[in-house]
Amino acid sequence: MITAVYPGTFDPLTRGHEDLVRRAAALFDKVVVAVAYSRNKKPFFNIDERVEIAREVLGHYPNVEVRSFGGLLRDFVREQNGRVIVRGLRAMSDFEYEFQMAGMNRHLLPDVETLFMTPSDQYQFISGTIVREIAQLGGDVSKFVFPSVERWLQAKAKARREQAETE
């Protein structure tokens, strides 16, 4: 059985992320979507929310699991008996960073391969950062995220706007 691990912050999970998960699920026996705590970032959604959102969107895939992790990816991949790390590349600008990370992961996990996947054409431009910004400004994000994610975004953006108004 070959297990692939797809790590990311998924803040929020977009249609582009789901596209990669769907395609990876067709290639591997098991795909673990590894939602990172992201210590170096200030996430819009907390870890529990991001895991719940991912489970809502991806729960219908029988060979996909969603889990959170907060330590080294190396340790998480070992715990999951992972053989492959899946990474998405939207543009050449992503490649340099991802190439360096793949090299480091190869050093730390010599038995694990990194598989770079490019998004389907209609998702190449989608990023969680842009989706969050559009949502915070009250824009329509329905083409970029699933309806359940859109509801999460709208509720969180509204709560943040209301909080800002009272401060």
Curated annotation (Swiss-Prot):
<keyword id="KW-0067">ATP-binding</keyword>
<keyword id="KW-0547">Nucleotide-binding</keyword>
<feature type="binding site">
    <location>
        <position position="73"/>
    </location>
    <ligand>
        <name>substrate</name>
    </ligand>
</feature>
<feature type="site" description="Transition state stabilizer">
    <location>
        <position position="17"/>
    </location>
</feature>
<comment type="similarity">
    <text>Belongs to the bacterial CoaD family.</text>
</comment>
<keyword id="KW-0173">Coenzyme A biosynthesis</keyword>
<feature type="binding site">
    <location>
        <position position="41"/>
    </location>
    <ligand>
        <name>substrate</name>
    </ligand>
</feature>
<feature type="binding site">
    <location>
        <begin position="88"/>
        <end position="90"/>
    </location>
    <ligand>
        <name>ATP</name>
    </ligand>
</feature>
<dbReference type="Pfam" id="PF01467">
    <property type="entry name" value="CTP_transf_like"/>
</dbReference>
<dbReference type="GO" id="GO:0005737">
    <property type="term" value="C:cytoplasm"/>
</dbReference>
<feature type="binding site">
    <location>
        <position position="17"/>
    </location>
    <ligand>
        <name>ATP</name>
    </ligand>
</feature>
<keyword id="KW-0460">Magnesium</keyword>
<dbReference type="GO" id="GO:0015937">
    <property type="term" value="P:coenzyme A biosynthetic process"/>
</dbReference>
<feature type="binding site">
    <location>
        <position position="9"/>
    </location>
    <ligand>
        <name>substrate</name>
    </ligand>
</feature>
<keyword id="KW-0808">Transferase</keyword>
<dbReference type="InterPro" id="IPR004821">
    <property type="entry name" value="Cyt_trans-like"/>
</dbReference>
<keyword id="KW-0548">Nucleotidyltransferase</keyword>
<feature type="binding site">
    <location>
        <begin position="123"/>
        <end position="129"/>
    </location>
    <ligand>
        <name>ATP</name>
    </ligand>
</feature>
<feature type="binding site">
    <location>
        <position position="87"/>
    </location>
    <ligand>
        <name>substrate</name>
    </ligand>
</feature>
<keyword id="KW-0963">Cytoplasm</keyword>
<dbReference type="GO" id="GO:0005524">
    <property type="term" value="F:ATP binding"/>
</dbReference>
<dbReference type="GO" id="GO:0004595">
    <property type="term" value="F:pantetheine-phosphate adenylyltransferase activity"/>
</dbReference>
<comment type="pathway">
    <text>Cofactor biosynthesis; coenzyme A biosynthesis; CoA from (R)-pantothenate: step 4/5.</text>
</comment>
<dbReference type="InterPro" id="IPR001980">
    <property type="entry name" value="PPAT"/>
</dbReference>
<protein>
    <recommendedName>
        <fullName>Phosphopantetheine adenylyltransferase</fullName>
        <ecNumber>2.7.7.3</ecNumber>
    </recommendedName>
</protein>
<feature type="binding site">
    <location>
        <position position="98"/>
    </location>
    <ligand>
        <name>ATP</name>
    </ligand>
</feature>
<comment type="subunit">
    <text>Homohexamer.</text>
</comment>
<feature type="binding site">
    <location>
        <begin position="9"/>
        <end position="10"/>
    </location>
    <ligand>
        <name>ATP</name>
    </ligand>
</feature>
<dbReference type="InterPro" id="IPR014729">
    <property type="entry name" value="Rossmann-like_a/b/a_fold"/>
</dbReference>
<comment type="function">
    <text>Reversibly transfers an adenylyl group from ATP to 4'-phosphopantetheine, yielding dephospho-CoA (dPCoA) and pyrophosphate.</text>
</comment>
